[in-house]
Amino acid sequence: MGKKQNNRKVVKSQRKSHREKEEETLAKLQERIDAYDPVVDEKSISQFSDLPISEETARGLKEASFASLTDIQKKTIPISLKGEDVMGTAKTGSGKTLAFLIPTIESLIRNKITEYDGLAALIISPTRELAVQIFEVLVKIGKHNNFSAGLVTGGKDVKYEKERVSKMNILVGTPGRISQHLNESVGMETSNLQVLVLDEADRCLDMGFKKQIDNILGHLPPTRQTLLFSATQSDSVKDLARLSLANPKRVGISSDQELSATPESLEQYYIKIPLDEKLDVLWSFIKSHLKSKILVFFSSSKQVQYAYETFRTLQPGISLLKLYGRHKQTSRMETTMKFSQAQHACLFATDIVARGLDFPAIDWVVQIDCPEDAATYVHRVGRAARFGRAGKSLMMLLPSEENGMLKRLNNNKIELKFMNIKQKNKKTIRPQLQSLCFQDPMIKNLGQRAFISYFRSVYVQKDKDIFKIDELPSDKFARSLGLPGAPKIKFKGGSDNKEKKNMSRQLAALSKSNNEGDVVPEEDKKVRTKYDRMFERKNQTILSDHYLNLTGSKADTAEKSDDDDEDFMAVKRQDHELRDDELPDLSIPVSKRSAKKALSKKASVAGKGNANKLKFDDDGVAHAIYELEDEEDFKKQGDARVQKDTFLNKETELMNNADIEDKLTAKEKRQEKKRKRKEMEKNMRQESDDEDENIQTVVSIGGDDIDLDRDLEHSSADEDVPEPKKPKWFDNDKNVNKDEDDGVVEYDEPQTLEDLEALTSKLLEH
């Protein structure tokens, strides 16, 4: 017993000393933070090791190869460590992710958050890819801390997340899924929340997450630290900051230090090109940059699919990838990882990639379609030249888009250089695209959908000084896609389509989910047969509504009895003038006898008179078949004798022509009849020759019995009358005389047994 008590005392003393050491370390750390003056100490800080942060965080930053601080990190991290709200603005690729992750981890360390305290930090990003990237950086720099972190995004199992979300200290996710967990997950408690981070806040609002963000803010306690970061500052972002931040410190790179919103190491070019030559130029560009890492932006997912499928079939000699919003989560993650790890590759993508994602070492950012505004341009080209690295961008502008877009960019202090395209380097792929569309119906369908989606994307744009849909050559663009003609397009509400395009598709799915968070699939539409429609059919007679009112239930009449007194002496309808469409049709029969008479065809025809046949001339004017002329009209045509002679000559000519045709017809009929007769005679001769060849001679020797069956087999079944017998050899005197004269005896072939005996006796005599 004594040893156990001594061991317990030792353990308690060790725990006490450990706690005292931690408290002492935290106290010193807090002193450093309180003593920090952003105005004085900002220039002296250049490394992460100079910051007043914990040893665990500093070790994680060192192992992740993060050493130097960027401008936004120098200004933001010390203020955030003091616990103040921050509204940060900086250009893309400036290191905003570490600017809010380090203060988040340090805040949890100073508040002594453990795994039993529940949710303490919430980080919200607009896209799944950006959330995954933030989570990966968080794991790298915070692996030496004892916090639990989780990632919740759309496209994953909600039940699996609900079972574990209550045990997380740091939660990274998209607005839609976080809002769903706050509404449905029982164990998700936010009363102990310390830090809220909104990354790419302007993009969250543009994608239609305003309601979800408002819902999230309603669940969070007011005593929290809020960090809001964005590359641009819009009115909606300022409104959000006013609602969620308390006395925020606005941090950003000043205009004196930054001439434009794009990185200084980025070389920016643009070319002026017709719409129908964009794919040819893109193909030529890829073929001439096979040893580069290229990111190509399109305005719609349909264009991404068409370009990917056609270029993949033509095999440019570089790895091709595609990424757009309708991809499944696993496929999107796989594509993101492949492009990040690839040294030379080309990624076709939509604006889903334009925000926050950090792809290492991108050489070229190519914008096939004009961005909707200057902010979108900044985010697109910001994928290259990140963290001071070199990079280039190329934007293709139509002649109708050049002046307006360059004016918008100049207003934001963004200058682009014009690039000429050498015709010898440009290769056309229009014949190959036409061949692919002709051979593969799937590619043809993708081309049609790409055509329609491009025109719709131009139609929904608000800046009509840049996007002029009336000046787009639709027929030439359709032929450049390999299509035989321009498909028909129906345009509907532009503003509604714009909101639907930017809104997250996961929100629509979440609105249809049940209490368990599972998305309820829509019921398949059943095939309705004619019998189903027959049983669903109601009374179609003209008295149906009136009949239902007359045969209403007693309960209905009882309920309406109380209202009858209120309607007493009430004006139902004021006197007014009747319109023509309100007058009744008196021609409709009102009695059964009249209706029966109207259905009788004979009775209906009797009162209508005789029918008149009409003929129509070339102008569509109706004339009677026989029209009588007046005497005056007849005299206007000339003398009667002249008219008579003209009529006779005309009719004579018609008769002569008809006579020639009749003679030719008669001649053809005679020749045809003669040909058939000759053919019939020829067939008869062939049949007779075949019968003669089939005749066989049978000689029976010995025995008195005659084989009648064998004789019948060789007899003709068609012979009704037997042929006359030929004269015998001994009855023919001419043969005898001839034999005597020539010395040669000729005998007929014996046909019967008697002939054979006679022949034998004759031979014996000779």
Swiss-Prot record:
| Motif Q motif in this chain | 46-74
Which enzyme type, at the first EC level?
A: hydrolase
The keyword RNA-binding appears for this protein:
yes
Which InterPro entries is this protein grouped with? DEAD/DEAH_box_helicase_dom, Helicase_ATP-bd, Helicase_C-like, P-loop_NTPase, RNA-helicase_DEAD-box_CS, RNA_helicase_DEAD_Q_motif, SPB4-like_CTE
Please note every region of biased composition (Basic residues): 1-18
In chain numbering, motif DEAD box lies across: 199-202
Point to the regions of Acidic residues compositional bias: 739-752
MF terms per GO, please?
ATP binding; ATP hydrolysis activity; identical protein binding; RNA binding; RNA helicase activity
A Gene Ontology biological process term = rRNA processing
Helicase ATP-binding domain location: 77-251
Q: Where do Basic and acidic residues bias regions lie?
A: 493-502, 572-581, 660-671, 678-687, 709-738
Query: Region entry Disordered: which residue ranges?
Result: 1-25, 488-525, 572-614, 649-752
Q: Where is the Helicase C-terminal domain?
A: 265-437
Where do the annotations place ATP binding? A90, K91, T92, G93, S94, G95, K96, T97
EC no. given is: 3.6.4.13
Please provide the record's keywords in A-Z order.
ATP-binding, Helicase, Hydrolase, Nucleotide-binding, Nucleus, Ribosome biogenesis, RNA-binding, rRNA processing
Indicate where this protein is primarily found: nucleus
Compartment(s) of residence? Nucleus, Nucleolus
The record's catalysed reaction(s) read: ATP + H2O = ADP + phosphate + H(+)
Instruction: One GO cellular component term, please give it.
Output: small-subunit processome
* Domain-level remarks: The Q motif is unique to and characteristic of the DEAD box family of RNA helicases and controls ATP binding and hydrolysis.
What this chain does, per the record? Answer: ATP-dependent RNA helicase required for ribosome biogenesis. Involved in the release of U14 snoRNA in pre-ribosomal complexes. Required for pre-rRNA cleavage at site A2.
Q: How does it assemble?
A: Interacts with the U3 and U14 snoRNAs. Associates with pre-ribosomal complexes.
The UniProt family comment states: Belongs to the DEAD box helicase family. DDX10/DBP4 subfamily.
What name does UniProt use for this protein?
ATP-dependent RNA helicase DBP4
